[in-house]
From Swiss-Prot:
The keyword Cell membrane applies. One of its GO terms (biological process) is chitin biosynthetic process. It is found in: Cell membrane. It comes from Fusarium oxysporum f. sp. lycopersici (strain 4287 / CBS 123668 / FGSC 9935 / NRRL 34936) (Fusarium vascular wilt of tomato). Residues 100-117 have a biased composition (Low complexity). CDD domains: Chitin_synth_C. The gene is chs1. Residues 67-79, 135-150 have a biased composition (Polar residues). Its main location: membrane. Glycans are attached at N79. Keywords: Cell membrane, Cell wall biogenesis/degradation, Glycoprotein, Glycosyltransferase, Membrane, Transferase, Transmembrane, Transmembrane helix. This is Chitin synthase 1. It is an enzyme of class 2 (transferase). Polymerizes chitin, a structural polymer of the cell wall and septum, by transferring the sugar moiety of UDP-GlcNAc to the non-reducing end of the growing chitin polymer. Plays an important role in nuclear sorting or distribution. The keyword Iron does not apply.
Length: 903
């Protein structure tokens, strides 16, 4: 933390944050009333008067002394001495047009108490129920507010030139929200509802605080403590995806505000929550999404600037406390007014710099100013459950050592599960479910989750901080931004940081002299849409597989880093067991393509035995073997030279072929096992039911496979979530060869591609600039009529259902950057992978002679081959069953702990 934090003499009975939110302060805060007061956040003198704004119909909100917010706008220099009577605004809004803008708030070097410049009555303790100002009833007689103010002085709209004051070169404007929006929501004279605050950041995120930028929460008479800091990162998501996420966030905030008996939450819980939306590139944001933000009052067109005093603006920051929520009806987003207030922070980055840069703005720029307790990460399109964010927070509240947590990611299945009709969606649904039933609970039981998904996870802010030497989790996390920004980086590191969230988890748990753990919170759910076409799935899994594979290698190689942590010996031993388990899984993942071919070859060849299919089985075995080779080679050729988007039909055809292969393999396994049982039944020595389990073929094929399925079913039933076994198991089984062959082949053949797939043209419309002399400059700002007209235009953008318009790709999007070095290393990785897998197949099929499985026990010369075949098949199939059993044990322990923990 910055050494200037906490420099103010201690005036609070609890001058420091408690070690854990599990022991909340009596006042309900985990932080001082003024933890950052070093004089940088002084208040204005008594000459600053407040601008009275028209109250909303029928009701208004009463501000409290602690909620007093200084007007923080760029005012006309002609009105610096003060404003006219506040009440005149309601009579003629145009007459006080300039009064919207007053001196921009900026920190002062000297230290000042919070009550400076106010009446002496504020020296007494804060009373949230005592109004700061004498409010007039909203239904008091007054002239109705006019949406179309009178034209004044021949000034052209959108060309209202204002002189603004800058402090140390920072442009900060407090802009009035459109009157038509203001009339829809209750408000008083508190300008967090009546004004939108714009800051033009001209610095790197790491320098945001040092360059004297601040945020609204620090400007109140009693700075608001941020308990929950929620970030929604987006690129070019449309209004439906954005509204889906924001709807879930708003429901969570309402849920926390409706917990009157909570020590932390309650009626004013929204004051402790800040929702940050970071959009990756001004040229990339979806126009409908931008219009939606404008409809909420968070964004205004025509305010942003390109440069300030010759310095390029890196991010446009809009702050507003909105009372306008969203709802989706018939694929159209609608605004819902008069809802729970939500503190919004919208950061529109000037250039596209990828998601990791968006997180750097969130953590290092805004997080340093607000110093939140818990940070929640969401992707636009992920919809959290109605109380999921609360349950994530509760996990930190109950466990002081919890440094990070994640919930259950669900596949979006549509109304009545209609998306399950798509086999790809059903297969991914099964994947997600089993991961949340077996994998995540196992890792949570050990205390180390290999990846907290960036789409829906949470971290304790203090746990992420670097040490005094600048080393720590965030330092390692943001290293990936420079690696992908053009600096010299090896292929290993570049691919590893495709899964930068895995690196963050590892560095958090192994943090020096700390003992943070990671937890899975089953009661917290997040719903996301999954790829519904083969090409989208291939592109998504390329980054997932490569990133997770190289990150797993990084974790295994750096396992000794756990020794630098402050974990107990028992916890470190548990980590050791978990890493052995992860190493075994990684070995199986490396040899997955070889193992699948061996199982295929052994089963199909065995069907050619005279006691099985005979000549028909031999012919089918040869045909399927040739087709297997052709389609596998096709996978390599497509992966090495073609874009999936241009080869969609071929990839779809391969999915169908591998599904047919899987059907044939399932038939072979069942048919061979049944024939083996029949042979035992017809044995001349008589039949005993126990002999079935002594039959090696039945024991190897049926028991091992069914034990895996049985574990899946039992675990799903115990978790009270078994429906995917009925709706998605068959699709998952049929697409398993596609996951093994198509996705793995494409991922390894494209290890040279270290992009997120979001590169593009950064050309964007130029914005006006501001140049100042002696801290004073001129800029164009809209008047009230402009605000209303602009607001209506923004509403019209998303009023109708979106119609997809096909656009011609730009030349820059069609060109591929030449990466000879990466492609050379890619070739080496693919060759090693292919040779090792083919070597395994050759060893088993040629050297060991394990090319047949036959239930016929009369041929003595095949006894040795059968024995060795059983050995190999037993190792493969029972290893799968054993790994599933290990996950099952971990999941059961997770349930036992969860019964006592409560979340």
């Amino acid at each position: 933390m910055d050494p200037r934090y906490g420099a103010q003499p201690q005036q609070h009975p609890h001058p420091h944050r408690t070690p854990s939110p599990g022991q909340p302060l009596q006042q309900g805060y985990q932080l001082d009333d003024n933890p950052f007061d070093d004089g940088r956040y002084g208040q204005y003198g008594p000459s600053q008067q407040h601008l009275a704004m028209p109250s909303g119909p029928d009701q208004h909100r009463l501000p409290t002394p602690s909620d007093h917010l200084n007007l923080n706008a760029a005012q006309s220099v002609d009105n610096l001495s003060g404003y006219g009577p506040p009440g005149d605004y309601a009579v003629n809004p145009e007459a006080h047009h300039d009064a919207y803008y007053n001196q921009p708030y900026e920190p002062r070097p000297q230290q000042q108490p919070y009550d400076q410049g106010y009446d002496q009555e504020y020296d007494q303790p804060y009373d949230d129920h005592r109004p700061m100002l004498q409010h007039q009833p909203s239904d008091a007689p007054s002239e109705p507010y006019q949406d179309q103010p009178q034209q004044g002085g021949g000034i052209k709209r959108w060309k209202t030139v204002k002189q603004v004051l800058l402090y140390r070169g920072n442009l900060v404007l407090d802009c009035p929200v459109p009157p038509v929006l203001l009339q829809q929501n209750p408000h008083g004279e508190r300008d967090e509802f009546t004004h939108m605050r714009y800051s033009a950041a001209t610095c790197d995120p790491n320098d945001f605080y040092d360059h004297d930028f601040t945020l609204r929460q620090r400007l109140f008479t009693k700075p608001r403590h941020t308990e929950l800091f929620i970030v929604v990162t987006m690129y070019n998501e449309d209004d439906i995806l954005f509204a889906r996420t924001m709807t879930g966030v708003f429901k969570n905030i309402e849920y926390m505000c409706n917990r009157p008996n909570s020590k932390t939450w309650g009626k004013d819980a929204w004051k402790k929550i800040v929702v940050c939306v970071v959009s990756d590139g001004r040229s990339k944001i979806n126009p409908r999404t931008k219009a939606l933000l404008a409809g909420m009052g968070v964004y205004q067109e025509g305010i942003a600037k390109q440069q300030v005093n010759g310095k390029d603006v890196t991010a446009h920051i809009y702050e507003y406390t909105t009372q306008t929520h969203l709802q989706i009806k018939n694929d159209v987003v609608q605004l819902v007014h008069r809802r729970q207030p939500v503190q919004m922070l919208f950061c529109l980055k000037e250039k596209n710099a990828k998601k990791i840069n968006s997180h750097r703005w969130f953590f290092t720029a805004f997080g340093r100013v607000l110093d939140p307790n818990i940070c929640v990460l969401l992707d636009a399109g992920t919809r959290p459950g109605g109380s999921s964010i609360y349950h994530l927070w509760k996990a930190f509240d109950l466990e002081p050592m919890c440094g990070g947590a994640c919930g259950e990611i669900k596949a979006m299945l549509g109304t009545g599960g209609k998306y399950l009709l798509n086999p790809l969606v059903a297969a991914q649904n099964f994947e997600y479910k089993m991961s949340n039933i077996l994998d995540k609970p196992l890792e949570s039981a050990f205390g180390f989750i290999s990846v907290l998904p960036g789409a829906f996870s949470a971290y304790r802010y203090v746990a992420l901080q670097n040490d005094k030497n600048g080393k720590g989790p965030l330092e390692k996390y943001f290293l990936g931004e420079t690696l992908h920004g053009g600096s010299d980086a090896g292929l290993f590191e570049s691919n590893m940081y495709l899964a930068e969230d895995r690196i963050l988890c590892f560095e958090l748990v192994t943090k020096r002299n700390c003992h943070w753990i990671l937890q899975y919170v089953k009661s917290a759910t997040g719903e996301t849409d999954v790829p519904d076409t083969v090409t989208e799935l291939v592109l998504q899994r390329r980054r997932w597989l490569n990133g997770s594979f190289f990150a797993a290698i990084y974790a295994i190689v750096h396992f000794l880093d756990f020794l630098r942590s402050d974990h107990t010996f028992l916890r470190k031993f548990a980590f050791f067991i978990e890493f052995i388990f992860n190493t075994i899984n990684m070995i199986f993942a490396w040899f997955a393509i070889g193992n699948f071919f061996l199982v295929f070859k052994i089963l199909t060849t065995s069907l050619g035995d005279d006691t099985l299919l005979g000549r028909t089985g031999e012919i089918l075995g040869v045909v399927f073997t040739w087709l297997y080779g052709v389609f596998l080679i096709t996978c390599f050729v497509l992966s090495l030279g073609n874009r999936p988007a241009g080869s969609g039909r071929l990839y779809t055809a391969m999915c169908w072929f591998w599904a047919i292969i899987m059907i044939y393999l399932l038939f072979a396994a069942i048919f061979i096992a049944v024939k083996a049982i029949i042979a035992d039944v017809n044995d001349a020595n008589g039949f005993n039911f126990a002999d079935i389990f002594k039959n090696k073929v039945f024991y190897m094929l049926i028991i091992s496979v069914m034990s895996t399925f049985g574990i899946w079913l039992i675990a799903s039933l115990i978790m009270l979530d078994p429906w995917h076994m009925a709706t998605s198991l068959v699709q998952y089984m049929l697409l398993t060869p596609t996951f093994t062959n198509v996705l793995n082949v494409y991922a390894f053949c494209n290890t040279h591609d270290v992009s997120w797939g979001t590169k593009g043209d950064d050309k964007v419309e130029k914005l006006p600039s501001v140049n100042t002399k002696d801290g004073t400059g001129k800029t164009d700002l809209p008047d009230e009529g402009d605000l209303n007209a602009q607001y209506q235009r923004e509403l019209a953008v998303f009023a109708q259902k979106h119609v997809e318009v096909k656009t011609t790709p730009t030349p820059s999007q069609l060109q591929e950057k030449q990466m000879d070095y990466y492609r050379g290393v890619r070739t080496g990785v693919v060759l090693i992978w292919m040779v090792s897998n083919f070597g395994l197949a050759a060893l088993v099929l040629s050297s060991a002679g394990l090319d047949r499985i036959s239930p016929n026990k009369d041929k003595d010369h095949e006894a040795e081959q059968l024995s060795r075949s059983n050995i190999y098949m037993s190792i493969v199939l029972w290893s799968v069953a054993g790994l599933s059993a290990f996950k099952f044990i971990g999941a059961m322990w997770f349930l036992v702990v969860r019964m006592f923990r409560g979340v």
